[in-house]
Amino acid sequence: MENSTNFTQPTPPVVNTQRRSFLRTVGAAAVTGGLLTACSTADLQVRPDGARAAAPGDVITLPGGDLGILNYAFVLEQIEARFYELVLANPYEGMTAMEMQLFQDLRNHEVTHRAFYRTALAGAGIPDLTLDFSSIYFRQRTDVLEAARMFAEIGTAAYNGGGKYLTDPENLAVAGKIVSVEARHVSIIREMQYMNQTAFSGDNIVIDGLFIKKEPSEVLPMAQKYIRETIDARNLPTTVA
């Protein structure tokens, strides 16, 4: 794949090691707790054939209610987890040991989130999606960091915008824990990207960062670019119960 970006790679920054240590501690506890108790029997129609993997061209219809919102989150977690797996499988030129460790931490968080939804939703969960990241040039540091920030920001906005539709307090608590991790991902990626000590806690992060929110109807078209199946979200709730 050709690289259409023609400029000199910047010198990678030295990322604050205390922040890296903090990042490593926030992911593990984020998905403990609630076990999707609001998922009704009527909702358990996402995967009637019990298949684990989808095929390109399939239409995957999300259900309504809490189960629909949780599967919507599962879509996003699949994208993020696979993205970081590919970042580490195809490290860009000049990736420092510190950056490698940060990406490993980010991957571990997202893989944990993906595994949580896969296990908790079980037969009511969507299949494993066929993902396409061909638009991202993984050998270019700037492309990788821009994509990482975009995925983290979309994830944060999606949880903030979709959480209000969850009717069970335990499900909402789990979503709240995960979105706090996503918001911290945004901050650490911004520090890597902009190479200064204010990017981690700039005004737009401290003041506005936790209040960025998007509806599923805004998020899924952005996510669809990376999914070879079609996600049908017509059943997702659009009003607060």
Question: What do these predicted ranges mean?
Answer:
Residues 37-38:
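C-terminal motif of bacterial Sec signal peptides marking the signal peptidase cleavage site
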Residues 2-16, 26-28, 41-241:
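All-alpha RGS (Regulator of G-protein Signaling) helical domain and cognate RGS-like helical scaffolds
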Residues 29-34:
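Bacterial N-terminal signal peptides
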